[in-house]
Amino acid sequence: MHGLIADFIHYLDVERGLARTTQVSYQQDLTTFMAWLSDQKQTTFPEDFGVIQAFLKHQNDTKAPASVSRMISALRKFYRFLLREGAIKSDPMTKIDTPKKAQHLPATLSGTEIDALMAKPDTTKPLGLRDRAIFELMYATGLRVSEVVGLRLDQLHLAMNLLQVTGKGDKERLVPISPQAADWVNRYLQESRPRLIKHQQPKAVFVNFHGHALTRQVIWKNLKAYIASVGIEKDVTPHTLRHSFATRLLENGADLRVVQELLGHSDISTTQIYTHLSNQHLVAVYHKTHPRG
């Protein structure tokens, strides 16, 4: 069973060209599936619809709808692969419907909360200056955390206030960066990064104390710690900075298509969730400013 999963991941990489982050997510989902099958004394990947249904019911009881949807997507592709390779005779996933994602409004940070967060890292220390540069960059550009950790030195064009970003599906886009955020990144590059990389020559812009490329998990953990230390009680993740970036743009009159391009969304319907947030802002402004509001 391990071998089939490894073959599938290799297929996703070589033949489908899926992004590494997607490959890792699918591998984790299939490993979870295999562990559950082992608990059920199953030694092969089942073709029985009922077994798949029981597994997904277990997942629904313990995981968020978005995670279950991704799990179904992984299983659907995996079973197609197994059928193609002759490892199974029938595909039970054809009977499984993908649940509709519940659309929820993402959390955002106010201007005051952003200021409090930015002021928290100790910029007299290498790691503090690095963290400030990361937060300034994320809020100024709306980059995904995976795009931040994947950012290379040769993708920085700070003199032109531009970044060359590799997004989902390895699609590249140019993203503008504010002069303020560019200044913080420059400070990090000049003052902190040389002290962190020591004698190494990593291509990654952002590195850890040992000079290795930073991970998404470290940024997530550090952000959580800073948020807690300034007393913000919202459930804040790196994606919250991306949400806040998009919401501020729309509140200040940016065109939805422009925001779509900046965020790297392939489908504008993904971007449209932010219009609900900006509409809330419009209603609040109306009630505050209109004489009969």
UniProtKB/Swiss-Prot annotation:
The gene is xerD. Residues 104-287 form the Tyr recombinase domain. GO terms for biological process: cell division; chromosome segregation; DNA transposition. GO terms for cellular component: cytoplasm. Keywords: Cell cycle, Cell division, Chromosome partition, Cytoplasm, DNA integration, DNA recombination, DNA-binding. Residues 1-83 form the Core-binding (CB) domain. PROSITE patterns: CB, TYR_RECOMBINASE. It is found in: Cytoplasm. Signal peptide: none annotated. Belongs to the 'phage' integrase family. XerD subfamily. Site-specific tyrosine recombinase, which acts by catalyzing the cutting and rejoining of the recombining DNA molecules. The XerC-XerD complex is essential to convert dimers of the bacterial chromosome into monomers to permit their segregation at cell division. It also contributes to the segregational stability of plasmids. Forms a cyclic heterotetrameric complex composed of two molecules of XerC and two molecules of XerD. Its main location: cytoplasm. The keyword Cell cycle applies. This is Tyrosine recombinase XerD. The active site is at R144, K168, H239, R242, H265, Y274 (o-(3'-phospho-dna)-tyrosine intermediate). NCBIfam families: PRK00283.1, recomb_XerA_Arch, recomb_XerD. GO terms for molecular function: DNA binding; tyrosine-based site-specific recombinase activity.
